[in-house]
Amino acid sequence: MVSSVLRDARRIVVKVGSSLVTNEGRGLDEVAIGEWCRQLAALVRGQGGEPREVIMVSSGAIAEGMKRLGWSSRPGEIHELQAAAAVGQMGLAQMYETKLREQSMGSAQVLLTHADLADRERYLNARSTLLTLLRLGVVPVINENDTVVTDEIKFGDNDTLGALVANLVEADALVILTDQKGLYTADPRRDPQAQFVHEAQAGDAALEAMAGGAGSSIGKGGMITKILAAKRAAGSGASTVIAWGREPDVLLRLARGESIGTLLVAQTQKNQARKQWMVDHLQLRGSVTVDAGAAAKLREDGKSLLPIGMVAVEGDFVRGDVIAVRDAGGTEIARGLANYASAEARLLCRKPSAEFERLLGYAAEPEMVHRDNMVVLGAR
C-alpha cells in the first residue's frame, strides 16, 4: 500500500522532530537539515516523477534556544521556554533559508498556533497564504509560535501541528520523521519481543495501546503523539508515514514508492472527508443566491463562485463562515467558506472583480467562494 499512497501523493506535509533537527539537543544539525532540504527541492522539481507540493513542519526552536543559552535541561517555567523559543527560532529560520537557497529554492517562515486554525477567518487566511506559497514554488517552513502561546508549549507538540496543517491544505500525505524506525507493538528499547508494524489503519484504538509513552527527552512528543496525529490527519483523508529521519534519501525513496517505516492508512478519501466536514459539521451563517449561469458552472464544472453571478445575499456572516449557495428556485446547490463578509458581498453582487477595490477599498480574492473551499452538493 505504501508504494501507491506516497507515490501518488502530490501535496505532502513533512514533519521533523526536535531530536533530529538538533542532533539530540547538541545544536542544529546542519548536515541533516541540508539533506532534507535537498530532498524537498528535488520533490518540488519533480525529480524522477511529477512535481510535488511540500510543506515542512519543523520542531527545534526551543531546543536550539536552550543550546544557545547554555541550558542543559528543559526548563519548567513557561516564560523561560518562551524565551528559548524566541532565541532558537532565529537560528532555525536562518538554517532552513540557507539550505533551501543552496538548492535554488525559496522558503517562507510561517508561525502558527492552534488558535489560528480554530478561528474560521484566520484558518482561511492561513490556508490562502500557504496555497499561494505552494503555487509560487516556495517551501513553507512552519513551527508553532511558542513565544506567544502557553498551552502549546505545556501540552502541545508539532506532530499535532503537522496533522492540522495536513488538514488545512488538504494534503495527500503526512510524513513524520522521527528518531525511531517506525511503530512497534511495544517499546523495542525495553521489550525484545516487540514486532515492527509495517502498516495499520489510522485511528485504530489498538495503536494507542502499542505506542505507550516512548519518546526522547528533547522534544515533547513520543510515539503516542504521532499515532494521534495520524488519526487527526486521516480526518481529511491524509495517510501518514512514520519513518526514521536519518534513513538515506528517505523522502525521495518514499515518493518513489519504497516501503519505509510505518504506514497508517486513512480510511476516508480526501474529497469525501472534506464534504462530510463541510456539509455535516459546520453551521451555516448565511446564503447567496446565484443566477442560472453561475448555478450551471457550479453543478457541471465545479467552478469557483464569482460575485458577478450572485443576485442576492441573506444572513449576517463574516469572512471564513460557511454559507449556502442557492439557485433561483431556492435549492441549495453548494456550500463553502465565504471570502467576504455579508455586507461586502451585497456590494459585490453582479460586479466583476475589477471593481472590487473601488467598491471596498481593497480586493481580497476574486472569488466569493473558491472551489477548494466549496462542496457541490449534487456531487456528494
Swiss-Prot record:
It is an enzyme of class 2 (transferase). SMART domains: PUA. One of its GO terms (cellular component) is cytosol. It catalyses: L-glutamate + ATP = L-glutamyl 5-phosphate + ADP. Its EC number is 2.7.2.11. The keyword Oxidoreductase does not apply. GO terms for molecular function: ATP binding; glutamate 5-kinase activity; RNA binding. HAMAP family: ProB. Belongs to the glutamate 5-kinase family. Catalyzes the transfer of a phosphate group to glutamate to form L-glutamate 5-phosphate. This is Glutamate 5-kinase. It comes from Acidovorax ebreus (strain TPSY).
